[in-house]
Amino acid sequence: MDYRSAGVDVEAGRAFVDRIRTSVEATHRPEVVGGLGGFGGLMRLPEGLRKPLLVSGTDGVGTKLELAQDHKSHHNVGIDLVAMCVNDVITSGAEPLFFLDYMATGALSPDAMAEVVEGIADGCRQSGCALLGGETAEMPGFYPPGRYDLAGFCVAVVEEDNLIDGRRVQAGDSILGIASSGVHSNGFSLVRKILECCAAGADTRVGPEQTPVIEALLKPTHLYGALVRTLLGANTRIHAMAHITGGGIPENLPRCLPKGLMASVDPHSWPRPELFSWLQTQGELQERDLWHTFNLGIGYCLILPEADVEGARTLCSNSGFESWVIGEVIPASEPQDGPVAGLPA
């Protein structure tokens, strides 16, 4: 009896690390010290910071992993993992520095695992952060063969004086919604249930490009870090930002607002992607459930003065993102019909 007969192939693990080395090292920033394979990743803080604040975030991809593995969308789900973490930490105005990943599997599949890590590295390159390290755990008997789970961890930095924490938000500020790529990485327990029960079939085509539903569902989550850096670099006066994840706009937009203020959103101010209408029809979903589960086409929100909206929209367009003014900040009213005025409570 040996470790391999127990289900753990150490040699395959070494070969896997060698295979991903080039992709990982391509993400490294000048501040990275050393290379892949040490007990810990090392990185200097960027030069010129006076009062740096570190911002951290950790997340996973949820049950989107189930669909991704069924349809061999390993690269895309690696991007999803980075996006779920990076899109959170940048809401404070921070610059992502490095990313760590954790991957657990029942039996190491070098091709699939390499695709995942290459997707993670792709997401890191797009976000300007280093893939500083990670852990791949082979756990036979705990996970079924061919299945894996993912978790990610990101650290970013922001000058304390430049921290975006909602304190500057005022009544009358505009809410700019930035387009999502689709469902992103939330609500997939419901999505999977709909796919199990629907009669239309997962090969149904949706949207202006007639994309197969499965392909539309597995599009990677948009990464908003480069766009936010562009906006801040142009001195856009961003007062707050929200990453629209689980709970949709009603549960995420209020998180970035100070006490005494609330958001008012016009649900007809942007076009709802056909994919969400398809999910609603096939799942016979109530409108409230739709709003409180999915992003409905808005993946990220900026709160900024009305005077800055036109310039911000131009920068969004130049960066390849559609955007819409979807509402404004108003004084909080008592009693409230819901967390966001204009949307189902």
UniProtKB/Swiss-Prot annotation:
Primary location recorded for the protein, binned into one broad class: cytoplasm
EC number per UniProt: 6.3.3.1
Domain of life: Bacteria
UniProt GO BP: 'de novo' IMP biosynthetic process; adenine biosynthetic process
Compartmental location: Cytoplasm
Enzyme class, spelled out: ligase
Pathway: Purine metabolism; IMP biosynthesis via de novo pathway; 5-amino-1-(5-phospho-D-ribosyl)imidazole from N(2)-formyl-N(1)-(5-phospho-D-ribosyl)glycinamide: step 2/2
Keyword Endoplasmic reticulum: no
Molecular-function GO terms, alphabetical: ATP binding; phosphoribosylamine-glycine ligase activity; phosphoribosylformylglycinamidine cyclo-ligase activity
UniProt keyword annotations, A-Z: ATP-binding, Cytoplasm, Ligase, Nucleotide-binding, Purine biosynthesis
InterPro entries, alphabetized: PurM-like_C_dom, PurM-like_C_sf, PurM-like_N, PurM-like_N_sf, PurM_cligase
Pfam families per record: AIRS (PF00586), AIRS_C (PF02769)
UniProt feature coiled coil, ranges: none
Swiss-Prot/TrEMBL catalytic activity: 2-formamido-N(1)-(5-O-phospho-beta-D-ribosyl)acetamidine + ATP = 5-amino-1-(5-phospho-beta-D-ribosyl)imidazole + ADP + phosphate + H(+)
GO CC terms of this entry: cytosol
HAMAP family: AIRS
Family: Belongs to the AIR synthase family.
Protein name: Phosphoribosylformylglycinamidine cyclo-ligase
